[in-house]
C-alpha cells in the first residue's frame, strides 16, 4: 500500500510538472524561450529584468541552446 501511494505521488508530481511546462511553453514547440518565461513570470506578478530572465534560462539550460526543453525543466523542478 505504501508503495502504491508513493507511486501515485510520483505520477501526480510528474503530471503537475508536465502541466507547468505546458503553461510556460506558450507556442507548444517543446521549448521554453526567454520571452515565454518572461511572459509567464510577468503574469504571476514577478517583475524581472531581461538579465534576470536570461539568468534563469542559463541556470536551467543544460545543453546551452538558449532554451529550456522538457528534460531540463524536469531537472530544474526536481533539483530542490
From Swiss-Prot:
Transmembrane segments: none annotated. It holds the Pfam family EF-hand_7. InterPro entries: CALM/Myosin/TropC-like, EF-hand-dom_pair, EF_Hand_1_Ca_BS, EF_hand_dom. Ca(2+) 3 binds at residues 25, 27, 29, 36. One of its GO terms (cellular component) is cytoplasm. Residues 12-47, 48-80 form the EF-hand domain. PROSITE patterns: EF_HAND_1, EF_HAND_2. The keyword Calcium applies. Ca(2+) 4 binds at residues 61, 63, 65, 67, 72. The keyword Membrane does not apply. Keywords: Calcium, Metal-binding, Repeat. GO terms for molecular function: calcium ion binding; enzyme regulator activity. One of its GO terms (biological process) is microtubule cytoskeleton organization. It comes from the Eukaryota. Belongs to the calmodulin family. Calmodulin mediates the control of a large number of enzymes, ion channels and other proteins by Ca(2+). Among the enzymes to be stimulated by the calmodulin-Ca(2+) complex are a number of protein kinases and phosphatases. This is Calmodulin.
Amino acid at each position: 500500500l505504501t508503495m502504491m501511494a508513493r507511486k501515485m505521488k510520483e505520477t501526480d508530481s510528474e503530471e503537475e510538472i508536465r502541466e507547468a511546462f505546458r503553461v510556460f511553453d506558450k507556442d507548444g514547440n517543446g521549448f521554453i524561450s526567454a520571452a515565454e518565461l518572461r511572459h509567464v513570470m510577468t503574469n504571476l506578478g514577478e517583475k524581472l529584468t531581461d538579465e534576470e530572465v536570461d539568468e534563469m534560462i542559463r541556470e536551467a539550460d543544460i545543453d546551452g541552446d538558449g532554451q529550456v526543453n522538457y528534460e531540463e525543466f524536469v531537472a530544474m523542478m526536481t533539483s530542490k
